[in-house]
UniProtKB/Swiss-Prot annotation:
Record's function text: Part of the ABC transporter complex UgpBAEC involved in sn-glycerol-3-phosphate (G3P) import. Probably responsible for the translocation of the substrate across the membrane.
Domain ABC transmembrane type-1: 77-268
Keyword Translocase: no
Species: Salmonella typhi
Keywords associated with the record: Cell inner membrane, Cell membrane, Membrane, Transmembrane, Transmembrane helix, Transport
Membrane-spanning ranges: 16-36, 85-105, 113-133, 142-162, 202-222, 247-267
Protein name (Swiss-Prot/TrEMBL): sn-glycerol-3-phosphate transport system permease protein UgpE
Membrane topology, as annotated: Multi-pass membrane protein
GO terms classed as biological process: transmembrane transport
């Protein structure tokens, strides 16, 4: 039992407040920069008081983008959403069916196949990414949604998590389904899926954020500005050489990019937390 000491309470709350301040201060600076005009954002030191140009900056990047040959930011956001949602649905579908087959079907070398999937976690991304790009290029899938999403739909981690959960389900459920004459897919649809809802919610949130925050993969696969994603697009807004970066518009784009993941987390936070807790049981 932890003693309720006043000094310990003050210390822990102080550290909590400091941690929150460290995390939120860069976001506040980005928000302030997004509200300033082109002149004020380059003042040294930059003011920490919000300006009045937030909506104007958002409107500019939303319709026109930033820089030369830049796509409208709404199109980048749409591409990011399509990519994140497709990866999420595909990853959950592939992982659930793979884990279901490994746990409930009896076929030769099924455990070997699982460990072959699992061992891919030991390979760094840098080792896997360039052979994957070569495959996508040979399949003529560069500059396409298929090239953006299909290679990221397989997940050893998600397959492992679903496998561990399925192994906790009692064998009596399988026997009851067999007695009722249920097919494997009916057993999956009517019994396994409802029992997996909390795990699905947790994995949906994690995978959506993973897909939304993809940076390196879109840079390697996409050269068409109209297929660019928001995260990679922000990097393209930063001028190189003698160009001048419109930091107020870049920060406005960053704030817009934060909205979808935050909405997903807030909308599914209860199911997300419950899924994480259930996965540890």
């Amino acid at each position: 039992m932890i003693e309720n000491r006043r000094g310990l309470t003050i210390f822990s709350h102080t550290m909590l407040i400091l941690g929150i301040a460290v995390i939120l201060f860069p976001l506040y600076v980005a928000f302030v920069a997004a509200t300033l005009d082109d002149r004020a954002v380059f003042e040294t030191p930059m003011t920490l008081l919000p300006g009045t140009q937030l909506l104007e900056n958002i409107k500019t990047i939303w319709v026109n983008g930033v820089g030369v040959n830049s796509a409208p930011f709404w199109l980048m956001m749409l591409n990011s959403f399509i990519m994140a949602f497709s990866i999420t649905v595909g990853k959950i579908t592939v992982s659930m069916l793979s884990a279901f087959a490994i746990v409930w079907f009896r076929f030769p070398l099924r455990n070997l196949f699982f460990w072959m999937i699992f061992i891919t976690l030991m390979l760094p991304v840098e080792v896997r990414i360039f052979p994957t790009v070569e495959v996508i290029a040979n399949l003529k899938m560069l500059n396409s949604y298929a090239g953006l999403t299909l290679p990221l739909m397989a997940s050893a981690t998600a397959t492992f998590l679903f496998r561990q959960f399925f192994m906790t389900l009692p064998d009596e459920l399988v026997e009851a389904a067999r007695i009722d004459g249920a097919s494997p897919m009916r057993f999956f649809r009517d019994i396994v899926l409802p029992l997996s809802k909390t795990n699905l919610a947790a994995l949906f949130v994690i995978t959506f954020i993973y897909g939304w925050n993809q940076y390196l993969w879109p840079l390697l696969i996409i050269t068409d500005v109209n297929l660019g994603t928001a995260v990679a697009g922000i990097k393209g807004m930063i001028a190189t050489g003698e160009g001048t970066t419109q930091w107020n518009q870049v920060m406005a784009a960053m704030l817009l990019t934060l909205i979808p993941p935050v909405v997903i987390v807030l909308a599914m936070q209860r199911a997300f937390v419950r899924g994480l807790v259930d996965s540890e049981k």
